[in-house]
């Protein structure tokens, strides 16, 4: 898969501020005004609440923000970010143009696309953050492109994700390095692999990866969805799934509900391969004694789909200043290093470590843990977010079970 095409699709002109964040903050009166206004505000941070590790990390951040800035951070736990989009959309329709229910949101992909296009986001603001100067916009271009949609300062990058497979090396000593090798492997090991049922997002990501590896037309997939070319563009996906499904768990007539269910099935030996969007997921679970130490993580050699997840501020947030301060702290080396540590979360950083001071760089020093990816593959950008719903609907029409 040509990496040059990916970068051409992604790169946006511009560069981050070339000064240290602390010095920038001291010399910028606008930021000083934001800091002063933020003190005493409460930030209602709407974010997925399905992980104890992530929830604990946000509790730690709340303590730091209270101590440093007198800001109260309240984690509003979501099952699906689409809940937030619907709520903010309803508030706008009802004329609630200020004093909104959400101040900060963990978003990306189709949710960002919807909020940006419907005028549901405050901004631009993110590239004005002092901490944004350390973001690796050159080496991680998805920090400025979200599912092929330019960010344009409307959300702040928070963490990285990439489709990653993991397997018990005691059962799978040689792991498939491509979708074609995976198909050959499942033919020889029927019933030992599956993927989460779309529209679960990792299941949908698996579909997009399969399409890209099997001849999906990139020019179309990285542009907004077109009904006129849908059948032709997605034909390689359905052909590949028709070949794959008979060899999956339950012969492809049932699908696991979630990556969590798949992980447990792998731990129980029912599945031998699984997948995740966090390259450190298996390492986290090995450290927690939930997976055996023989589990290894890997990515397809030519590359796998990856993206950045972001922080957005709804247009009608009541605490916009404090929300910016929270985002700035979550982008700091201290917060990013703790987030990257598998003992706390294991979410890869968006920062360029070579931009950091020696002391801040040292915060990220850690030995490679069992289960971590040892040979990272190139990151492929997400297809345009408008392709998600049509692909999911067609998958359900063809393969969905009630």
Region annotations inferred by a language model:
Residues 112-114, 273-292:
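A ligand-binding cleft/hinge motif common to bilobed small-molecule-binding domains
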Residues 147, 161, 240-247, 255, ...:
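Periplasmic-binding protein-like
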Residues 304, 309-376:
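Mature extracytoplasmic/periplasmic domains
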Residues 48-60, 76-83, 98, 102-260:
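Extracytoplasmic ligand-binding site segments that recognize negatively charged/polar headgroups
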Residues 122-134, 155, 183, 287, ...:
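Short beta-strand->loop
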Residues 31-39, 46, 51-72, 165:
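Short, polar/charged alpha-helical segment
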Residues 2-17:
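N-terminal secretory signal peptides and thylakoid transit peptides that target proteins
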Residues 264, 370-402:
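Conserved C-terminal helix/tail region of periplasmic/extracytoplasmic solute-binding proteins
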């Amino acid at each position: 898969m040509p990496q040059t095409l990916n970068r051409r699709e992604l790169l946006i002109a511009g560069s981050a501020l070339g000064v240290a964040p602390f010095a920038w903050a001291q010399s910028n009166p606008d930021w000083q005004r934001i800091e002063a206004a933020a003190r005493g505000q409460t930030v209602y941070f709407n974010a997925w609440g399905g992980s104890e590790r992530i929830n604990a990390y946000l509790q730690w951040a709340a303590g730091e923000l209270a101590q440093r800035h007198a800001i109260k951070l309240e984690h509003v736990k979501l099952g699906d970010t689409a809940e937030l989009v619907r709520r903010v959309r309803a508030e706008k329709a009802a004329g609630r143009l200020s004093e909104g229910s959400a101040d900060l949101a963990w978003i990306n992909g189709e949710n960002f696309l919807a909020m940006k296009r419907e005028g549901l986001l405050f901004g631009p603001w993110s590239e004005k953050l002092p901490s944004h100067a350390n973001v690796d916009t050159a080496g991680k271009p998805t920090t400025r492109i979200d599912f092929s949609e330019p960010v344009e300062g409307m959300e702040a990058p928070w963490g990285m994700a990439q489709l990653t497979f993991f397997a018990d090396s005691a059962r799978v000593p040689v792991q498939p390095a491509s979708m074609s090798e995976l198909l050959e492997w499942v033919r020889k090991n029927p019933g030992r692999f599956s993927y989460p049922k779309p529209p679960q997002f990792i299941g949908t990501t698996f579909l997009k990866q399969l399409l890209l590896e099997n001849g999906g037309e990139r020019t179309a997939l990285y542009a907004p969805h077109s009904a006129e070319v849908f059948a032709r563009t997605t034909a390689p996906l359905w052909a590949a799934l028709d070949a794959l499904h008979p060899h999956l768990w339950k012969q492809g007539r049932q699908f696991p509900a979630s990556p969590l269910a798949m992980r447990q099935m792998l731990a129980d030996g029912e599945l031998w391969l699984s997948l995740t969007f966090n390259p450190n997921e298996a390492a986290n679970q090995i450290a927690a004694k939930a997976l055996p130490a023989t589990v290894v993580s890997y990515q397809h050699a030519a590359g796998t789909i990856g993206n950045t997840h972001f922080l957005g501020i709804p247009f009608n947030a009541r605490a916009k200043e404090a929300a910016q301060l929270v985002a700035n702290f979550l982008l700091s080396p201290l917060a990013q290093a703790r987030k990257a540590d598998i003992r706390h979360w294991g979410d890869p950083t968006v920062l360029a470590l070579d931009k950091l001071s020696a002391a801040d760089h040292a915060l990220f020093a850690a030995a490679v843990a069992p289960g971590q990816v040892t040979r990272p593959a190139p990151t492929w950008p997400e297809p345009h977010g408008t392709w998600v719903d049509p692909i999911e609907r067609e998958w359900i029409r063809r393969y969905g079970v009630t």
